[in-house]
């Protein structure tokens, strides 16, 4: 298990681990992050800070990532202003930052190098044994599991994760070993910058298709290119249960280990059972004794994520005892099927869960896990669609999967910088689900009214889940932190959008 460490604001942080600095970055003194509050950006910033670099950054608002980095010694300002970058050696930008941002404009004027997040991650990985986890779904969970298994196996990895690893209290840490475990982002094809020693592909699904000009074949080609960034002695660990991954196997010219429930998987799960939030299964590997395991995560999709961790760990020589212990004691990740609270109302006792899944496949997996683990509970979902383009492109899939819950509340689309698209909004989605005839969805035009609307629908023994990748995480926290039925909940607007009422 990765333990939490004390975070303090110390002037010694800037000289904390200079021996671990990237050798060829010796001329770099101050690294400035534009959009430092994002999980991926903040994670890389934390590792670089602990390597001894001066870190500064800017974002549009305070969050836990910003507060943590400040406590570690980073200089962070709220708001994007040209003067923020004047003393920087290099600028790191997230994909959410557009070219007209005043800090980018000033950096180009001063000829300060501007790199994307993945390029900086690639530099961290260059002189380490990199393990990069790619795929449409499950990257954060799989990365967290691998980091936890390696830590339990005394390998002390550096890790950069797109979510909060609960046992560590952070999403990034500088380890003492040669291992670096990190997510590889396909959303903008920036994972092609990475040159790891081991690459994992959890699955391939249609998402972020604007990056690939709407061409699924181009998306598949890009995954093959990612795998072929491995050296000839590298290893591809891939989920053979995913039909697209299976289709691509003949095109992979690197050593491959497959995993899954399929009979022909190299690392195979059998005898799957789910008991509440715990999944039990047996791992079979040819030539080895079967290994009974439990992972503190619900659902078959999470067993697949665990299998990826088992496959990578076994290849790196982690013993079975450490693997089993890490999975059994795994404390989860923030916003990945995270139980927030048990609560009581006039209607009875209930539980509140929060989940990041925002693609129809992810929502479907969550619903299945809940049905299997808690078959006696009614499922009440509060869903916030993420991006108008995704809602448009996967509209019928959303209608189908969201119709499978018992009670549905739909918040307005989280735009993430996009312009609204006609008939790809939550009101249209609610109308289509209603016409399907399975459930009667509730469109929530004013998020402040959500507690009162929930109160009219809740029943004893319900399981309430807040689902989505946008500002709904703040809604979930407010519901958990206050009385669900008597306290108004609000959402802090992000840089791109606000949740607006229909008045």
From Swiss-Prot:
Its EC number is 6.3.2.8. Residues 1-22 are annotated as: Disordered. GO terms for molecular function: ATP binding; UDP-N-acetylmuramate-L-alanine ligase activity. ATP binds at residues 135-141. It is an enzyme of class 6 (ligase). It catalyses: UDP-N-acetyl-alpha-D-muramate + L-alanine + ATP = UDP-N-acetyl-alpha-D-muramoyl-L-alanine + ADP + phosphate + H(+). Pathway: Cell wall biogenesis; peptidoglycan biosynthesis. InterPro entries: Mur-like_cat_sf, Mur_ligase_C, Mur_ligase_C_dom_sf, Mur_ligase_cen, Mur_ligase_N, MurCDEF_pg_biosynth, UDP-N-AcMur_Ala_ligase_MurC. It is found in: Cytoplasm. Pfam families: Mur_ligase, Mur_ligase_C, Mur_ligase_M. One of its GO terms (cellular component) is cytoplasm. Keywords: ATP-binding, Cell cycle, Cell division, Cell shape, Cell wall biogenesis/degradation, Cytoplasm, Ligase, Nucleotide-binding, Peptidoglycan synthesis. Residues 8-18 have a biased composition (Low complexity). GO terms for biological process: cell division; cell wall organization; peptidoglycan biosynthetic process; regulation of cell shape. Transmembrane segments: none annotated. Its main location: cytoplasm. Cell wall formation. Belongs to the MurCDEF family. This is UDP-N-acetylmuramate--L-alanine ligase.
């Amino acid at each position: 298990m990765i333990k939490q460490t004390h975070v303090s604001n110390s002037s010694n942080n800037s000289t904390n681990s200079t021996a671990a600095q990237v050798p060829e970055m010796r001329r770099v003194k101050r690294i400035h992050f534009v959009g430092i509050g994002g999980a991926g950006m903040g994670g890389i910033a934390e590792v670089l800070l602990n390597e001894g670099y001066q870190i500064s950054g800017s974002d549009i608002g305070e969050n836990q990532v910003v507060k943590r980095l400040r406590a570690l010694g980073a200089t962070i300002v709220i708001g994007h202003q040209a003067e923020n970058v004047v003393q920087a050696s290099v600028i790191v930008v997230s994909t959410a930052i557009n070219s007209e941002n005043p800090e980018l404009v000033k950096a180009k004027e001063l000829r300060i190098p501007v790199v994307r997040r993945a390029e900086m991650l690639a530099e961290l990985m260059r002189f380490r044994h990199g393990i990069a986890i790619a795929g449409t779904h499950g990257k954060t969970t799989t990365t967290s599991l691998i980091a936890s298994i390696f830590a339990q196996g005394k390998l002390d990895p550096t890790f950069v994760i797109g979510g909060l690893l609960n046992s560590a209290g952070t999403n990034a840490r500088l380890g003492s070993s040669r291992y670096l475990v990190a997510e590889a982002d396909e959303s903008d094809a920036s994972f092609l910058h990475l040159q790891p020693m081991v690459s994992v592909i959890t699955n391939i699904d249609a998402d972020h298709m604007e990056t690939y000009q709407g061409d699924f074949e181009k998306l598949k080609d890009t995954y093959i290119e990612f795998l072929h960034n491995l050296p000839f002695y590298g290893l591809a660990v891939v989920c053979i249960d995913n039909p697209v991954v299976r289709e691509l196997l003949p095109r992979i010219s690197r050593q491959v280990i497959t995993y899954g429930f399929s009979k022909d998987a190299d690392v195979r799960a059998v005898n799957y059972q789910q008991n509440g939030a715990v999944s039990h299964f047996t791992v079979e590997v040819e030539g080895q004794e079967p290994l009974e395991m439990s992972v503190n995560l619900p659902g078959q999709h999470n067993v697949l994520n665990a299998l990826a961790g088992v496959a990578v760990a076994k290849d790196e020589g982690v013993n079975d005892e450490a693997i089993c212990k890490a999975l059994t004691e795994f404390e989860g990740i923030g916003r990945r099927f995270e139980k927030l609270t048990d609560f009581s109302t006039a209607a009875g006792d209930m539980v509140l869960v929060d989940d990041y899944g925002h693609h129809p496949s992810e929502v479907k997996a969550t619903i299945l896990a809940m049905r299997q683990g808690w078959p006696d509970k009614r499922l009440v979902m509060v869903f916030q669609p993420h991006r108008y383009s995704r809602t448009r492109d996967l509209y019928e899939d959303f209608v189908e999967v969201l119709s499978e819950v018992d009670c549905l509340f739909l918040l307005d689309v989280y735009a993430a910088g996009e312009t609204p698209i006609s008939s790809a909004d939550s009101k249209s989605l609610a109308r289509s689900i209603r016409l399907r005839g399975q459930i009667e969805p509730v469109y929530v035009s004013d998020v402040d009214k959500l507690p009162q609307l929930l109160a009219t629908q809740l029943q004893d023994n319900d399981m309430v889940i807040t689902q989505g990748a946008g500002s709904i995480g703040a809604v979930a926290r407010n519901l958990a932190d206050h009385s669900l039925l008597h306290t108004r909940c609000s959402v802090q607007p992000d840089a791109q959008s606000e949740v607006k009422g229909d008045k």
